[in-house]
Amino acid sequence: MEIQRALVITGIAVVSYLMIQAWQRDYANTASPVPVEQVAEQGNSSSSDSADLPSVQSQTDNSIPSAQSDNDLPSVSPADIAQPTPSSQRIEVNTDVLRVEINPVGGDIVRLALPDYPKHVDTPDQPFVLMDQNSNGTYVAQSGLVGKNGTDSSKGRPHWNSAQQSYRLAEGDNELNVDLTLTQDSGAEIIKRYTFEKGSYLIRVSHIVRNNGSTPWTGALYGQIKRDGRDDPGLSKAGFAPMPTYLGAAYWSADKPYNKLTFDDMSEDDVKLDQTVEGGWLAMVQHYFVSAWIPDAKQKNHYSSVYLKSRDQYLLRFVSPNTTIQPGEESVLYSEFYAGPKQQDNLEAISPGLNMTVDYGWLWFISQPIFALLVFLQSGEVSVFGMDIDIGGGVGNWGVAIILLTLIIKAIFFKLSATSYRSMAKMRKVAPEMQRIKEQNKNDKQKQQMETMNLFKREKINPLGGCLPMLVQMPVFIALYYVLLESVELRQAPFFLWINDLSVMDPYFVLPILMGASMFLQTRLNPTPADPTQAQVMKWMPMIFAVFMLWFPAGLVLYWLTNNILSIAQQWIITRNIENSA
């Protein structure tokens, strides 16, 4: 029995240790943040923004790019060079799922809000702001043309012209184009076009170059995400103990589908990104949401990262190969930009591997089918090759779906659990005999162990049979933890009564208290350990776990509570049958 109890305690300790290690390895950002400098809402001076721009002449230079040579400077007139502009001149774009603001200086996305995802469950009319540039910090998407005839350089960035100050996707329309225009001294006309689609968080960014000049036009497309090192504004907070999630960069490459690049990595010269990738994507990942550049999949683009130490800003960028356009010809340099929720099916359809930004950790192969089953129970939909098929029968409530999922998991492990509870019941039945053996041979440990093993053999008891089945189920619990923590579908998902968000802690601690009470009842069905120390540990374990669960997502505690109730019922029936047997 001591072996059994020791293994149970060891299993709990190992699981807790692995969870803490996973948090620290994958999610913790231990770098001390540098105070963010005051940033004007529109990126005030041309020099401050241009210092962040990539250089096609020296793509291996991972420091802040220097000015290019004179003959490589862009052919923009002084009037086109960026000047400070008031925030009122931002171009506003509204679709059914996006609220976007574009700065004419550079044509950058400097604010992006998601009306379908409120900032707080109690303020449904206040959308979550994913990207923004203001005095509190910077998180923007930049793009442009660099090179000999590019629009962006160390000299500054262009001021794009727009026919309208505000754009809105009209009801009944499926697409909205926002055109920013620029004419270079060489005669080249450039249109920077943002294309928004109904119901989509994917934005097509096209640079249409019409070479009306007399000489070839040469340039390259770049796109980058610039973000400061502040905390994730969308982080789920639970009292004084926020649930930690990954905050940092990620990218796709052919040799490794999913690569994390933490902010600490980006600040180190020997770790930062610097490679050529065919297709792929670069992303800034945070809790529930992601922003990502998806370059032309047919091109080999140069991926790099830069850390601006003085401003505590991190840049993740790509630069395409040079494009040459002959006089009288036209060409389109394009990429795509995604900014929105981490919806797995949508992300997979956009670019291979982008759905991996929903980080289920090292047990992803268990988490993914659990999530698929949970979605089916809630909505009645199944995903086949990226297509959602509505079979019907969904319960329409994520909390009820979690309860049904628990029933299914419990049914799968029914026999294993029965083996465990049967072993525990037998141990409880022979506990008086074990105590007698211990007292009779308290001075002879070897004889005590021998007689105890003979007792186990005679009663057909496996001392490990009670704990090993429990340990087998632990990976499922950890995988479900990641599902409930990472899946944006459960963000602000209500259950019943006081629980209006299953992704955060129970505000009144009702579920953790009930979970602790259920654990206490379950321990009463187990044999009391002979060792006083182990007995004390098992006595206080329900309270310790109840306190530990106070700050866990309510959905996870609901799963554990439901599982405990089912386990108690199963164990009570098995224990009663064995104790009543001859």
From Swiss-Prot:
Membrane-traversing stretches: 3-23, 357-377, 394-414, 464-484, 495-515, 541-561
Residue ranges with Low complexity bias: 45-58
Topology relative to the membrane: Multi-pass membrane protein
Region ranges (Disordered): 38-92
Classification via Pfam families: 60KD_IMP, YidC_periplas
Gene Ontology terms for molecular function: membrane insertase activity
Keywords carried by this UniProt record: Cell inner membrane, Cell membrane, Chaperone, Membrane, Protein transport, Transmembrane, Transmembrane helix, Transport
Any coiled-coil regions, as ranges: none
Subcellular location, record wording: Cell inner membrane
GO BP, sorted A to Z: protein insertion into membrane; protein transport
InterPro entries: Membr_insert_YidC, Membr_insert_YidC_N, YidC/ALB3/OXA1/COX18, YidC/Oxa/ALB_C, YidC_ALB_C, YidC_periplasmic_sf
Bias type Polar residues, positions: 59-74
GO cellular component terms listed in the entry, alphabetical order: plasma membrane
Protein's job: Required for the insertion and/or proper folding and/or complex formation of integral membrane proteins into the membrane. Involved in integration of membrane proteins that insert both dependently and independently of the Sec translocase complex, as well as at least some lipoproteins. Aids folding of multispanning membrane proteins.
Record text on subunit structure and interactions: Interacts with the Sec translocase complex via SecD. Specifically interacts with transmembrane segments of nascent integral membrane proteins during membrane integration.
PANTHER family: CYTOCHROME C OXIDASE ASSEMBLY PROTEIN COX18, MITOCHONDRIAL (PTHR12428:SF65), OXA1 (PTHR12428)
UniProt-listed NCBIfam families: PRK01318.1-3, yidC_nterm, yidC_oxa1_cterm
Record family assignment: Belongs to the OXA1/ALB3/YidC family. Type 1 subfamily.
Protein name: Membrane protein insertase YidC
Native organism taxonomy: Bacteria, Pseudomonadati, Pseudomonadota, Gammaproteobacteria, Oceanospirillales
